Amino acid sequence: MASLFDINAAAAVKDYSIKPRLSYNTVNSITGPLVILDNIRRPQYNEIVNLNLPDGSVRSGQVLEVAGHKAIVQVFEGTSGVDVRKTTIDFTGHSMRIPVSEDMLGRVFNGSGLPIDKGPNLLAEDYLDINGSPINPYARIYPEEMIQTGISSIDGLNSIARGQKIPIFSAAGLPHNEIAAQICRQAGLVKRPTKDVHDGHEDNFSIVFAAMGVNLETARFFQRDFEENGSFERVTLFLNLANDPTIERIITPRLALSASEFLAYQTEKHVLTILTDMTSYADALREVSAAREEVPGRRGYPGYMYTDLSTIYERAGRVEGRNGSITQIPILTMPNDDITHPIPDLTGYITEGQIFVDRQLHNNAIYPPINVLPSLSRLMKSAIGEGMTRNDHGDVSNQLYAMYAIGRDAASMKSVVGEEALSQEDRLALEFLGKFEKTFISQGAYENRTIFETLDLAWSLLRIFPREMLTRIPKKILDQYYSRSSAYTESSKDVIDNTPESS
């Protein structure tokens, strides 16, 4: 007869809850990543189950569907090696939870939330449901104040507010991984005079990074980049590799967002959550849907993909009574560069803008190849201006957009009629176009520009045009910044100014 000590030890190892668990040996069939169970008493939707294999290994799964005494379970580690007759199933009685702690910063976890950095086990401060807690819409606060990425084309023209969700639309072969790593290295709060010392302190900012379906080389790139540049101590990294079970990709972003919610709402940090690649997530969703033999929607994706994506994207934001915020930047690769594909199409409906990575700019050796014309930040107005960035930010952004669009039109006209037929204004626009792409959009992978350096650089480019052509900037702002003597030009000393100096 087993001793009381042995019984207690076994209970601790198996993590028994207060309610006794029920074990079953009633596996009916296996279909892809799904296990169909019969004769189950009171199964619960989203309940976590443990599968005990004949070789002694244990795999975890989640109840996807309940019909009477039947249950469909998706196995996170895959169903390879699962024996229909000899596998036993333990029902835990609760949904999937992740242990969270401030010690998660500087750690690396796999797609199931287990540490893979050879560090000690996490001493949990709390256990959170990975599906998150519903937020009362009335308690949400409108996103305000800017998160600085150090990239001029984002900070200057598509500013990101704390609590915003804005995706990066990329494609195969484009440097979205390098852009994501650069944002992680450089992102922070705007340094500005404030009475709230705690809110503006760099220790009050952290990053949660989740990679789904990446290859080993990409995973090593992210880890090495964070470690070498000293930003790793403020980053929590979740890695789901390409050779990991596809089904694991469905829970990886939810684990990352649960960690973000703990850091934002319990430790009151400003958290930037980066999710890459959401295309891999959607493909995993399609695989599960096909295994369940559901009626497919557009291009084989499930009809509920819009709802499913919203359960991820809508977890960004700010909550009344908490100083923290969750800002979300999901990255997705558009199949065949098609922005009408269901994944970017549905993502654009849910999120608050987009940042567009352009193949033509990439082919012209411009990094980061962000095309600002199709890019948009819908909450930019609330993140910029006097007291948050600078009083000229909004007007400068509008003028840059206008002149860049005119320059693109002039370039198209030049290819048809030749440069000799262009007007003086068109030639100035062409000059601006070249310098804007080579000096403003283009910057080094390790070049971190503050928002003030970005605005100064923008003014040095706008001085290519006579003052009367800058029709989108009020006279008061022009008086303050147009003349060289009243502008800060440290960041723009390498830009040639072809206009005479204003008096």
From Swiss-Prot:
Keywords: ATP-binding, Hydrogen ion transport, Ion transport, Membrane, Nucleotide-binding, Phosphoprotein, Transport, Vacuole. One of its GO terms (molecular function) is proton-transporting ATPase activity, rotational mechanism. Pfam families: ATP-synt_ab (PF00006), ATP-synt_ab_N (PF02874), ATP-synt_VA_C (PF22919). Its main location: membrane. It is found in: Vacuole membrane. It is a peripheral membrane protein. ATP binds at R378. GO terms for cellular component: cytoplasm; vacuolar proton-transporting V-type ATPase, V1 domain. Transmembrane segments: none annotated. PROSITE patterns: ATPASE_ALPHA_BETA. Disulfide bonds: none annotated. SUPFAM superfamilies: P-loop containing nucleoside triphosphate hydrolases. InterPro entries: ATP-synt_VA_C, ATPase_a/bsu_AS, ATPase_F1/V1/A1_a/bsu_N, ATPase_F1/V1/A1_a/bsu_nucl-bd, ATPase_V1-cplx_bsu, P-loop_NTPase, V-ATPase_su_B/beta. Gene3D superfamilies: 3.40.50.12240. PANTHER family: V-TYPE PROTON ATPASE SUBUNIT B (PTHR43389:SF4). Non-catalytic subunit of the V1 complex of vacuolar(H+)-ATPase (V-ATPase), a multisubunit enzyme composed of a peripheral complex (V1) that hydrolyzes ATP and a membrane integral complex (V0) that translocates protons. V-ATPase is responsible for acidifying and maintaining the pH of intracellular compartments. Belongs to the ATPase alpha/beta chains family. This is V-type proton ATPase subunit B. It comes from Schizosaccharomyces pombe (strain 972 / ATCC 24843) (Fission yeast).
